[in-house]
C-alpha cells in the first residue's frame, strides 16, 4: 500500500470521527436545550398543589339563554366593586360575526350591569383577550386578532393604541404606570405609549391570561390548552424573572381570565366555545386559604 492511499484512509477516518463528534454534539444540544427543560417543567408540575374549585358559578346570560357568554379576560375593579370581563363576541368558532365587547358584571356573577360594545367603535376588532384598568379609570384591552393593545374610555371611545404581536393577558402596574402584557413567547413591561421597558422570555404551552400581585412583586399567569386535561397557574418572580408552576387546576379546562380577590382565585372558563371537558361558560373559585385537594374533593 503506497503512502498516498494510507493518507487518504487516514483522512477518511478523521472525517468520519469528526462527523460522529458533530452528530454527538447535536444530540447533546437537543437533549440539553429541548428535552431537559421539559423534564424539569414536568417535575416541577408534579410537585405543585393539585386543586379543585371550592365554588363554581355560571356566567350570566346575554343574548342566549343558559349559555352565558364567551369570556376572554377578567379584571376586578375594587373601586366600583364590579368585574370587567372581555366578551369575544361569538358563541362558537364557526359563528360568522364577532361582536366583541366588555361586560360589567356583579361580584357574585348574577347579572350583567352594563357593557361596552367595542365592535361598534373598531370595525377590524375580531375579539378581546385581556382587560385591565389604569388608575385614571381608562381601560386597556388586548385585541389579539389585530395584534394591538387598545386604550379606551369607559364609553368605548378610542384614546390610543400600540402594536404588539399576539397579546393575550394584560395587567396595569400602578407603581410605575406601566402595563404587563403576556404574548405567546414573552412577558413585556411597556409604557402607556407602547415602549418596551422589560422583556422576559416565557414559552409555556397555552400561556394566556395574567394577574399582577404588586405587593409581592409576582405575576400569575395561566397555561395549558388541550381543553380536556389539566391547566396550570404559574408565577413569575419579577425580582429574578423566573417562572415556575404553582397550582394544577384539575377542573378548569378552558381558562380565559384570572384574578385574585380576598384570597380567592377567580378563573374564567369558556368551555362552551371550545367544547371542553366541562362545556360551560363559568367561573371557578379557588379559596387559597382553604384549598380543595383531590383527597377532600367532593
Locate the predicted segments by residue.
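Repeated scaffold domains used in trafficking and secretory/extracellular systems
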Residues: 68-75, 123-132, 165-174, 204-213, ...
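Blade-level signature of beta-propeller repeat domains, shared across WD40, Kelch, NHL, RCC1
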Residues: 256-298
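Conserved beta-strand positions in repeat-built beta-propeller and related beta-rich domains
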Residues: 85-96, 141-145, 179-185, 221-228, ...
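Short loop/turn segments that connect beta-strands within beta-propeller blades
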Residues: 106-110, 152-157, 191-195, 237-241, ...
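Beta-strand-rich domains and repeat architectures in extracellular enzymes and scaffolds
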Residues: 62-98, 126-130
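Surface loop/turn motifs at the tips and blade-to-blade linkers of beta-strand repeat domains
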Residues: 57-67, 116-124, 161-165, 200-205, ...
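Structural motif
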Residues: 92-103, 147-150, 186-190, 228-234, ...
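Short coil/turn segments that connect the beta-strands within blades of beta-propeller domains
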Residues: 79-81, 136-137, 175-177, 215-217, ...
Amino acid at each position: 500500500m503506497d503512502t498516498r492511499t494510507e493518507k487518504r484512509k487516514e483522512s477518511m477516518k478523521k472525517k468520519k470521527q469528526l462527523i460522529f463528534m458533530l452528530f454527538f454534539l447535536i444530540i447533546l444540544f437537543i437533549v440539553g436545550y429541548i428535552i431537559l427543560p421539559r423534564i424539569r417543567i414536568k417535575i416541577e408540575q408534579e410537585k405543585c398543589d393539585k386543586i379543585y374549585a371550592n365554588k363554581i358559578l355560571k356566567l350570566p346570560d346575554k343574548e342566549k339563554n343558559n349559555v352565558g357568554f364567551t369570556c376572554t379576560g377578567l379584571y376586578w375593579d375594587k373601586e366600583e366593586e364590579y368585574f370587567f370581563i372581555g366578551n369575544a363576541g361569538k358563541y362558537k368558532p364557526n359563528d360568522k360575526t364577532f361582536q366583541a365587547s366588555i361586560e360589567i358584571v356583579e361580584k357574585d356573577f348574577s347579572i350583567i350591569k352594563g357593557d361596552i360594545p367595542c365592535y361598534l367603535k373598531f370595525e377590524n376588532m375580531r375579539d378581546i383577550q385581556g382587560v385591565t384598568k389604569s388608575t385614571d379609570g381608562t381601560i386597556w384591552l388586548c385585541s389579539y386578532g389585530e395584534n394591538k393593545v387598545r386604550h379606551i374610555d369607559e364609553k368605548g371611545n378610542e384614546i390610543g393604541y400600540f402594536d404588539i404581536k399576539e397579546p393575550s393577558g394584560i395587567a396595569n402596574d400602578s407603581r410605575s404606570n406601566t402595563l404587563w402584557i403576556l404574548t405567546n413567547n414573552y412577558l413585556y413591561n411597556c409604557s402607556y405609549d407602547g415602549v418596551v421597558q422589560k422583556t422576559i422570555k416565557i414559552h409555556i404551552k397555552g400561556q394566556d391570561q395574567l394577574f399582577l400581585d404588586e405587593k409581592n412583586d409576582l405575576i400569575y399567569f395561566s397555561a395549558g390548552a388541550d381543553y380536556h386535561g389539566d391547566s396550570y397557574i404559574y408565577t413569575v418572580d419579577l425580582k429574578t424573572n423566573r417562572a415556575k408552576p404553582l397550582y394544577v387546576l384539575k377542573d378548569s379546562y378552558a381558562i380565559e381570565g384570572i384574578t385574585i380577590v380576598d384570597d380567592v382565585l377567580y378563573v374564567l372558563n369558556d368551555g362552551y366555545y371550545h367544547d371542553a371537558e366541562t362545556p360551560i361558560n363559568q367561573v371557578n373559585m379557588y379559596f387559597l386559604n382553604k384549598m380543595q385537594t383531590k383527597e377532600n374533593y367532593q
